[in-house]
C-alpha cells in the first residue's frame, strides 16, 4: 500500500505541476516561479475543462481531462515560445549603421522572464529545505497518524467530499456547475466549489477509483510540496535579499495547528484548505505587477494574478476575500514605499490615494455583502463559544478550537516579527493583516450580532476559518521573528566565542546591500545590518544559533506535554492535531474495518449499482464515497442530504411496514430500491454510531427490521451486521 500511496502522490504532483508549469512558462515566468505558481493554473484549468467537458463531451474519462489540459497548455507554451523567438530575431537584425555591435547587443539582451530570480540555484536549495521540513512535519502529524493510507476521516463534511469525487468518477462529469452527492442517481446538481473534488477524482481514476487513497495523497502533496513552495516564493518576494528570513520560513509553512491542519481535523474543510494555500500564488504576481516598470509586464503579471485569484475563488470563494485583505493592505503600503525604499514617503497626495484605496475596498466589501448570491453565506451564523477574554488569550496562542494545541513558541516568534515590522515599516502591512485576522477570530468566536456578520460573514462566521485566516497571515511574521532571534542569539554567541568564530560569506552581486537583515529582534531602520550579519547561517555562531532556535521549535511543537484547564488537558504544538487525526482516521471508529469488509461482501452479493436503504449514523454515510455502494442516505441527518425530505422521512419511519403500506411500496418502486443494510444493532452492547443529528426515534422504520419482519429476507449477516432483500 505504501508504494501505491507514493504512486498516487506522484500522479497528483504530475496533474498539479505539469500543465500549470507549461502555462506559467508561456508568460514567461522564471523556472522557479513557474514551478511555484503551477498548481493555481492547473487547478483553474482542470476546473474550467470540467465545466466545458460537461457541455461538449459527456461523459469524459478523468484521465482524458488531465491529458487534454496538458496538451492545451503545451500548445500554448510552444506557440508563445515561437512568437517570442520570431520577435527576438526581428529585434536582433542589425542595420548598416550598427552591424558591428550586433553581437554585443545580443550578448547583453536582458532577460524577458517575469519574477526572475537572481542566483536561481540558491532558491532551489531553499525550496528543497522547505519541502524537507514540510515532509518531516507532515510525516509526524499526518502520515504517521493514518490507520492505513486508504483510511479516511470520520468527519461530517467528509461524507460530501468523498461522495462528490465518487460521483464525478461514476458519471464521467466534472462540472462545478453540476455538483451533488447523488450524481450517480441522476441528480443534475448545482454550483459547488468543487476544484478539490475534480483533482481527487482525476488522481483516484488512476488507482482503481480509490477516493480515500487519492484524498490522502492530495492532502500530503499540498502540505509537503505545494504550500511550502508557495510560501518560499512569497518570502523570497518580500524578503529576497535577506536569506536568513527566506530560509527561516521553511519551519513555518505547515507548523501552525490552525492552518493548514485545522482544516484537516475539522469538517473536513479541504476545499478551503487549498483555496487559502493558493492565495500566495495570486498575491506574488500582484505584488510584482505594482513594482514592474513596464506597462507590458504589469499587464502580464496582473493577468497571472487574476488567473490565480480565479483558482482561489473556484476552490472556495472566501479565499478571494482572504486575498483581498492582503492585496489592499500591500497596495496601501506600496503607496508610501517606492521599490527598494526602506523609509516611507508621506505627503498629502499619497495619503489621499491610500484613503481612496481603502474606501474603494470597503465599498466593494459592502457590495459583496449585500449581493443576493452571497446571502446564504453571509447570513450563516456560528454561535459564540468563548468569552472575549478567553478568545483574546487563545487567539495569540494559536489554539483557535479545542482540536488544536497551544503554540507558545510560535506566539513569541510572531510577536517578535510584529516588533520587527514596526521598526521596518515597509513590511508593517503584514502585521496589520495578521492583527485584523486575529480580530476577526475574536469577534467570530466570542460575539454575536451585526458586526460579526459584516466582518466575518464571508467565512460563514466560522471561527475555524477565521482562526485559520490568522494562522495563514502569521506565517511570514513567524519567519521574520525566527530570523531576528537567530541573528540576536548569534550576536550574543559571537561575543562569548570571540571574533574568530565569525566567517562571513562574501557578498555577492545580489546580496551586497541588505538593509533589512535582523541584527536583533528590535533592529531599527537607523542601524541597518550588513550582508555578513544577514547571512548568519554562514558563521559558526550563526549555525549554532540557528540550531538552538530550531531545537526550541521542535521541542515546543512536538514535546508530549499538557496542562490542565478545567476538565480537559491542553497539549502543546501539533501533538493534539496528531491525536485528532489518529482518532478520526481510525478503522475502530464509526465505520470500522469489519463493517467496511461487510460492505465489500454486500457489493459482491447484490447487482451492480443496486440501491441500498441504510441508516447513515451507523457509518454507512461514508460507504458510497469510500467503497462506491449506492446508498440512499449519504450524510448523518434525517434527510441524508437528499432534496426530497418527505420521501426520506417516509422511508426512515415506515419502511418496516412495506408489506402493508402502499405508499412505501410505490416509493421503493420509484427509487428502484430492493435492499436494506444495517451495520449496527441499536440494542447491542457496543454500537459504533454517530451521535451527530441522530435520534433513535427518527429511524424506527429501518432499525426495527429483523429477519421476522414481513417483507424482508435476510441474505447476508455477520455479527450485528445485516443485509435484507425487500420482498412484497
Regions flagged by a language model, labelled:
Residues 279-300:
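Membrane-interface transmembrane helices that cradle and orient dolichyl/undecaprenyl
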Residues 46-48, 139-146, 171-174, 246-265, ...:
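Membrane-interface helix-loop junctions at the exits of transmembrane helices
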Residues 7, 56-64, 148-154, 208, ...:
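Membrane-helix boundary/interfacial segments in multi-pass membrane proteins
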Residues 127, 135-277, 577-592:
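Active-site lumenal/periplasmic loops and adjacent helix-entry segments of GT-C-fold
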Residues 1-124:
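Membrane-embedded, hydrophobic transmembrane alpha-helices
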Residues 408-431:
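Hydrophobic, aromatic-rich transmembrane alpha-helices
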Residues 300-317:
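Membrane-interface alpha helices of multi-pass inner-membrane proteins
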Residues 11-14, 552-728:
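Extracytoplasmic
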Amino acid at each position: 500500500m505504501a508504494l501505491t500511496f507514493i504512486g498516487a502522490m506522484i500522479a497528483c504532483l504530475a496533474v498539479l505541476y505539469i500543465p500549470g508549469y507549461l502555462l506559467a512558462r508561456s508568460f514567461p515566468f522564471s523556472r522557479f516561479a513557474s514551478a511555484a505558481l503551477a498548481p493555481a493554473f492547473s487547478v483553474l484549468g482542470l476546473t474550467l475543462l470540467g465545466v466545458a467537458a460537461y457541455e461538449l463531451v459527456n461523459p469524459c474519462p478523468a484521465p482524458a481531462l488531465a491529458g487534454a489540459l496538458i496538451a492545451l497548455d503545451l500548445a500554448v507554451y510552444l506557440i508563445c515560445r515561437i512568437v517570442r523567438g520570431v520577435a527576438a530575431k526581428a529585434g536582433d537584425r542589425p542595420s548598416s549603421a550598427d552591424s558591428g555591435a550586433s553581437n554585443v547587443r545580443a550578448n547583453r539582451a536582458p532577460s524577458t522572464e517575469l519574477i526572475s530570480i537572481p542566483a536561481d540555484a540558491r532558491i532551489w536549495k531553499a525550496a528543497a529545505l522547505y519541502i524537507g521540513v514540510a515532509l518531516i512535519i507532515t510525516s509526524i502529524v499526518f502520515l504517521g497518524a493514518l490507520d492505513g493510507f486508504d483510511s479516511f476521516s470520520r468527519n461530517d463534511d467528509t461524507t460530501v467530499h468523498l461522495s462528490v469525487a465518487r460521483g464525478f468518477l461514476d458519471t464521467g462529469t466534472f462540472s462545478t456547475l453540476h455538483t451533488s452527492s447523488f450524481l450517480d442517481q441522476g441528480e443534475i446538481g448545482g454550483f459547488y466549489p468543487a476544484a478539490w473534488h475534480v483533482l481527487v477524482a482525476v488522481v483516484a481514476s488512476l488507482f482503481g477509483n480509490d477516493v480515500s487513497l487519492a484524498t490522502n495523497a492530495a492532502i500530503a502533496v499540498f502540505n509537503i510540496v505545494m504550500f511550502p513552495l508557495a510560501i518560499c516564493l512569497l518570502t523570497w518576494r518580500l524578503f529576497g535579499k535577506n536569506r536568513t528570513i527566506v530560509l527561516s520560513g521553511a519551519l513555518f509553512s505547515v507548523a501552525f495547528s490552525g492552518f493548514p491542519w485545522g482544516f484537516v481535523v475539522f469538517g473536513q474543510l479541504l476545499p478551503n484548505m487549498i483555496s487559502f494555500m493558493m492565495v500566495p500564488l495570486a498575491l506574488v504576481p500582484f505584488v510584482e505587477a505594482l513594482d514592474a516598470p513596464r506597462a507590458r509586464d504589469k499587464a502580464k503579471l496582473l493577468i497571472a494574478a487574476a488567473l490565480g485569484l480565479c483558482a482561489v475563488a473556484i476552490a472556495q470563494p472566501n479565499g478571494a476575500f482572504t486575498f483581498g485583505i492582503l492585496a489592499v493592505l500591500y497596495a496601501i503600503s506600496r503607496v508610501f514605499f517606492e521599490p527598494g525604499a526602506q523609509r516611507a514617503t508621506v505627503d498629502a497626495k499619497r495619503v489621499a490615494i491610500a484613503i481612496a484605496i481603502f474606501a474603494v475596498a470597503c465599498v466593494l466589501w459592502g457590495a459583496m455583502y449585500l449581493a443576493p448570491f452571497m446571502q446564504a453565506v453571509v447570513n450563516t451564523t456560528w454561535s459564540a463559544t468563548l468569552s472575549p477574554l478567553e478568545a483574546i488569550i487563545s487567539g495569540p496562542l494559536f489554539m483557535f478550537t479545542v482540536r488544536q494545541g497551544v503554540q507558545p513558541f510560535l506566539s513569541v516568534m510572531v510577536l517578535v516579527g510584529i516588533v520587527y515590522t514596526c521598526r521596518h515599516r515597509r513590511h508593517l502591512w503584514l502585521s496589520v493583516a495578521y492583527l485584523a485576522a486575529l480580530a476577526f477570530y475574536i469577534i467570530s468566536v466570542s460575539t454575536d450580532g451585526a458586526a460579526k456578520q459584516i466582518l466575518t460573514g464571508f467565512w460563514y462566521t466560522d471561527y475555524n476559518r477565521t482562526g485559520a485566516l490568522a494562522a495563514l497571515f502569521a506565517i511570514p511574521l513567524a519567519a521574520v521573528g525566527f530570523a531576528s532571534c537567530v541573528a540576536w542569539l548569534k550576536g550574543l554567541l559571537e561575543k562569548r566565542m570571540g571574533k574568530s568564530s565569525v566567517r562571513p560569506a562574501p557578498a555577492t552581486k545580489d546580496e551586497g546591500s541588505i538593509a533589512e537583515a535582523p541584527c536583533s529582534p528590535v533592529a531599527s531602520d537607523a542601524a541597518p545590518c550588513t550582508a555578513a550579519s544577514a547571512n548568519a547561517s554562514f558563521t559558526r555562531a550563526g549555525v549554532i544559533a540557528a540550531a538552538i532556535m530550531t531545537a526550541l521549535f521542535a521541542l515546543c511543537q512536538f514535546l508530549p506535554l499538557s496542562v490542565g484547564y478545567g476538565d480537559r488537558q491542553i497539549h502543546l504544538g501539533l501533538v493534539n492535531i496528531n491525536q485528532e487525526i489518529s482518532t478520526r482516521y481510525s478503522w475502530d471508529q464509526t465505520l470500522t474495518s469489519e463493517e467496511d469488509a461487510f460492505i465489500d461482501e454486500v457489493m459482491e452479493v447484490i447487482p451492480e449499482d443496486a440501491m441500498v436503504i441504510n441508516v447513515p449514523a451507523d457509518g454507512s454515510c461514508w460507504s458510497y464515497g469510500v467503497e462506491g455502494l449506492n446508498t440512499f442516505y449519504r450524510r448523518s441527518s434525517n434527510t441524508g442530504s437528499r432534496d426530497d425530505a418527505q420521501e426520506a422521512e417516509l422511508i426512515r419511519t415506515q419502511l418496516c411496514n412495506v408489506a402493508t403500506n402502499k405508499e412505501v411500496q410505490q416509493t421503493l418502486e420509484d427509487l428502484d430500491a430492493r435492499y436494506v443494510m444495517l451495520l449496527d444493532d441499536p440494542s447491542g452492547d457496543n454500537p459504533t454510531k454517530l451521535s451527530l443529528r441522530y435520534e433513535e426515534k427518527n429511524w424506527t422504520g429501518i432499525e426495527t427490521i429483523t429477519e421476522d419482519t414481513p417483507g424482508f429476507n435476510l441474505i447476508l449477516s455477520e455479527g450485528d451486521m445485516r443485509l435484507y432483500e425487500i420482498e412484497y
